[in-house]
Amino acid sequence: MAATDFIVAIELGSSKITGIAGKKHADGSIQVLALASENSSDFIRKGVIYNLDKTAQSLTSIIKKLESTLKASIGKVYVGIGGQSLRTIRNTEVRHLEEETKISQELIDSIMDSNREVPIIDQEILEVAPQEYKVGINLLADPVGVPSDHIEGRFLNIIARSSVKQNIDKCFKQAGIEIADYIISPLALANAVLTNSEKRSGCMFIDFGADTTTVSVYKNNILRHLAVIPLGAATSPKILQPAN
C-alpha cells in the first residue's frame, strides 16, 4: 500500500494516545485501516504534555504498530490539539473606507489577516471562526459585493498557550514523525457528530474526556463559544463522592 492511499491522525489524550489510519472514499466516508494506542496517563495531564521523552517513545510505538498493520511506511500525520489551555476570545477589526466601495474578498482576507496578527501574551491563535460582518446597520455572514464605506469584522479566535504546540512539535520531531497539519480536536469531533441542522438551529456539544470536559456552542452553523473545564471522567467520581 502506498503512503498516498491512506490518512493518519494522532490524538494526544490524557488517558491514551491514539493513532488511526484510514482511507477516504468519494462520498466522504472514512474506512478505518489500522488503529493503535498507548497509555499516556503518566505523562499527559489535562491534555498537556509533561514528559517529552515518554510522549515521543509512545508516538514511535504507535507509528510502528500502524505501519505493521498497513504494511507500509507512514510519511506524515495529522495531529489533534486539545487540552485545558484551549479557549476562545473575541476580537473586532474595523475598516473605514475613503468612499463607498463594493466590498471584495481581498478586503475580507485583509481583515482576517489583521485579526490573526493580534498579539496575545504567551498564547497562540490556532483557528478563527468568523462570526459576522457589520456593514452599515446590517449583520452579514458574507458581505462580499455589498457597497459600504465602513465594515466591522467580528471574530472568535481559538487560542492556546504557545508551549502546547511547541511541545507537540518537539515530541514529533524527536520521534522522527512529520506533521502534515494540526486539527482542533473539539471542532473535528463536533463536525463528525453534529448535523448542519443541529448547528444551524443552535446546540451545545459536550465531550467528556479523562481529565477535561470540552464544551462547544453552535448557532447559525457557526461556532460561538468553546471552553475546556479541568474536570473529566477520571476525576468526577471523586468529586461526586459524599463528604464524611
Roles of regions detected by a PLM:
Residues G13, Q241-N244:
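Gly/charged contiguous loops adjacent to phosphate- or pyrophosphate-bearing nucleotide/cofactor binding elements
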Residues F172, L240-Q241:
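Hydrophobic alpha-helix position signal
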Residues S201-I239:
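Glycine-rich phosphate-binding loop of actin/hexokinase-like ATP-binding domains
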Residues M1-K16, I20-F205, I222-R224, A233:
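Nucleotide/phosphate-binding catalytic cleft detector across ATP-hydrolyzing
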